[in-house]
């Protein structure tokens, strides 16, 4: 009985058949328009995805190469030029007077005549050599004995002597070779150094000047400032 009731209920219910699209049937216009819109939307999306993939690939594979380079700085020392300084020196002291060498006569008994003539010639030579020295020494010794230091002159006579810059002093046993350099000029014995000032003698360590008839001495290589 129950079995019959179930069969009747099934017969009364509507039967459902699934819709299976037939192959080869024409597609409607509405479905074709929907497909076109889908393709238009997918095309830009595909382009954007391709561009993003390309940018990501280049970003990963084209990273900048970083390399540390050490730069060595060369320091050039400054060039300093040193000029040599001129050396200012005083002239050398005058040479000592040349000694007079007298030959010694040895007696020879075998030739008395020759010894006599040699001794006579020697005496004549000695007399000739000593005569100029004696003539020059006498006035010089007299002037030296009467000379006073130039600093001891009275003020009136000091003003007559100009400033003297002593450059050089040359003394020799030969009076013709004696000379001094004063204020850049060379003077010899008897020369006028300035108006009223005469150089009358050049000794080994000083000179004798005559100022208004008064003899004064000035040390060699010592400047006179006036």
From Swiss-Prot:
Coiled coil ranges: none
Role of this protein: Involved in a general secretion pathway (GSP) for the export of proteins.
Pfam families in alphabetical order: T2SSB
Descriptive protein name: General secretion pathway protein B
Main location, first listed in the record: membrane
Keyword set includes Cell inner membrane: yes
Cellular localization per UniProt: Cell inner membrane
Membrane topology according to the record: Single-pass membrane protein
Keyword annotations: Cell inner membrane, Cell membrane, Membrane, Transmembrane, Transmembrane helix, Transport
GO CC annotation terms, alphabetical: plasma membrane; type II protein secretion system complex
Signal peptide location: none
Family, as annotated: Belongs to the ExeB/OutB/PulB family.
Transmembrane segments: 37-57
Cross-referenced InterPro entries: GspB_C
């Amino acid at each position: 009985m129950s079995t019959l009731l179930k069969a009747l209920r099934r017969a009364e219910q509507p039967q459902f058949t699934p819709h299976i699209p037939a192959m080869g049937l024409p597609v409607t216009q509405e479905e074709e328009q929907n497909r076109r819109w889908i393709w238009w939307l997918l095309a830009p999306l595909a382009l954007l995805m391709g561009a993003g993939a390309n940018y990501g690939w280049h970003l990963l594979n084209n990273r900048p190469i970083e390399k540390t380079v050490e730069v060595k700085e060369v320091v050039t020392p400054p060039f300093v030029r040193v000029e040599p300084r001129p050396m200012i020196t005083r002239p050398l002291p005058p040479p000592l007077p040349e000694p007079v060498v007298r030959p010694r006569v040895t007696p020879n008994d075998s030739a008395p005549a020759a010894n006599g003539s040699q001794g006579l010639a020697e005496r004549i030579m000695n007399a000739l050599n000593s005569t100029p020295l004696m003539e020059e020494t006498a006035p010089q010794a007299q002037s030296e004995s009467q000379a006073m230091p130039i600093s001891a002159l009275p003020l009136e006579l000091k003003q007559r002597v100009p400033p003297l810059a002593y450059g050089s002093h040359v003394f020799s046993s030969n009076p013709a070779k004696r000379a001094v350099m004063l204020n850049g000029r060379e003077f010899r014995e008897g020369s006028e150094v300035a108006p009223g000032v005469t150089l009358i003698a050049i000794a080994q360590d000083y000179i004798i000047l005559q100022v208004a008839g008064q003899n004064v001495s000035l040390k060699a290589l010592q400047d006179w400032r006036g």
